């Protein structure tokens, strides 16, 4: 390997250099090609991996499980009600127990400090499947998808806008990813929903070294102009109270990604991205409640955009598999 990431944790992109991130993206593309060609080599044969989920998941769980199986590893799923973590046993103690039984551990849950403790004490590679602050495996998938749809542009030549709740783990992580890779990112959101000042300052310092451009704005037209990609996420995140909806919907409605926003980019080849799940129709229980209460068909994105030729959300979702596999292979593979 050009870079030795063996035995490294993957907790947040701030811990990795641009060259290391590029290496993981290149490895992801290589593993994706091998899977399609049927030539994949099993580099995790005989490895045992624990998947800790204190928050439920579809894409992250499936991606980790299939990636592990493809590479020859065995997994143990530890769900929200399947352990004593935080109830009868601290994460520090849990880490030291699981680290003696498993070769690698994935954690999806709440505070970033929890996965940091796990990474400090486990003694084996720990991978962040999502915390309240960061979602680094998603960003790798996003960057790989942007490379695939970049029309010969390099990442540092791309412009993209994130609309909506920019203080959540996706806003934070996309800003970090853009800063690391020298990209032009616009965080388009109400000022109260911008990332915290300390993280913005950290990313601005990184941007000085990489040539990235970070813009925070409340103006949709200004923010999306000339973009190659538009990105959004749900307006109310996992674990937030139900009574947050009314205020949030009223505040975020101007930041919905609809066809007017697509056209405002001035780029007929612009692509739409979303980490999923998305509230874009009334085919779910939540979607029906939204339609009944707010008279809206879709929240953060309209059905028209979600199902349009601009949308690449399912290619993006598939890339969770390939990038997660790359992280496991790079840090644990033989």
UniProtKB/Swiss-Prot annotation:
Family assignment from sequence similarity: Belongs to the aspartate/ornithine carbamoyltransferase superfamily. OTCase family.
Gene, per the UniProt record: argF
Residues engaged in binding L-ornithine: 169, 233, 237-238
Pfam families documented for this protein: OTCace, OTCace_N
Organism of provenance: Vibrio cholerae serotype O1 (strain ATCC 39315 / El Tor Inaba N16961)
GO cellular component: cytoplasm
Record keywords: Amino-acid biosynthesis, Arginine biosynthesis, Cytoplasm, Transferase
Reaction catalysis annotation: carbamoyl phosphate + L-ornithine = L-citrulline + phosphate + H(+)
Cell compartment(s), UniProt: Cytoplasm
A Gene Ontology molecular function term of the record: amino acid binding
Biological processes, Gene Ontology terms: arginine biosynthetic process via ornithine; citrulline biosynthetic process; L-arginine biosynthetic process
Descriptive protein name: Ornithine carbamoyltransferase
Matching Gene3D superfamilies: Aspartate/ornithine carbamoyltransferase (3.40.50.1370)
């Amino acid at each position: 390997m050009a870079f030795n990431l063996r035995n490294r944790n993957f907790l947040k992109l701030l811990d990795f250099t641009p060259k290391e991130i590029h290496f993981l993206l290149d490895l992801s593309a290589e593993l994706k090609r091998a899977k399609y060609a049927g030539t994949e080599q099993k580099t995790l044969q005989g490895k045992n991996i624990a998947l800790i989920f204190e928050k439920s998941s579809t894409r992250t769980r499936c991606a980790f499980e299939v990636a592990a199986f493809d590479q020859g590893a065995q997994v143990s799923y530890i769900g929200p009600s399947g352990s004593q973590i935080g109830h009868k046993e601290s994460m520090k103690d849990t880490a030291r127990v699981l680290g003696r039984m498993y070769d690698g551990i994935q954690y999806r849950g709440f505070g970033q400090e929890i996965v940091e403790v796990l990474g400090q004490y486990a003694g084996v590679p720990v991978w962040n499947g999502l915390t309240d602050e960061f979602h680094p495996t998603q960003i790798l998938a996003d960057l790989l998808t942007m490379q695939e749809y970049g029309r010969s542009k390099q990442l540092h030549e791309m412009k993209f806008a994130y609309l909506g709740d920019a203080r959540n783990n996706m806003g934070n992580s996309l800003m970090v990813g853009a800063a690391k890779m020298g990209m032009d990112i616009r965080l388009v959101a109400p000022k109260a929903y911008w990332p915290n000042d300390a993280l913005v300052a950290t990313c601005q310092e990184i941007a000085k070294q990489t040539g990235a451009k970070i813009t925070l704005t409340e103006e949709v037209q200004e923010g999306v102009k000339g973009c190659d990609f538009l990105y959004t996420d749900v307006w109310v995140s996992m674990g937030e109270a139900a009574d947050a909806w009314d205020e949030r919907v009223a505040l975020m409605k101007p930041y919905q990604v609809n066809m007017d926003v697509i056209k405002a980019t001035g780029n007929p080849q612009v692509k739409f991205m979303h980490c999923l799940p998305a509230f874009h129709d009334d085919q779910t229980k939540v979607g029906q409640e939204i339609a009944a209460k707010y008279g809206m068909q879709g929240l953060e994105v309209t059905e028209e955009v979600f199902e349009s030729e601009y949308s690449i959300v399912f290619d993006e979702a598939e890339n969770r598999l390939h990038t997660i596999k790359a992280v496991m292979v790079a840090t644990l593979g033989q």
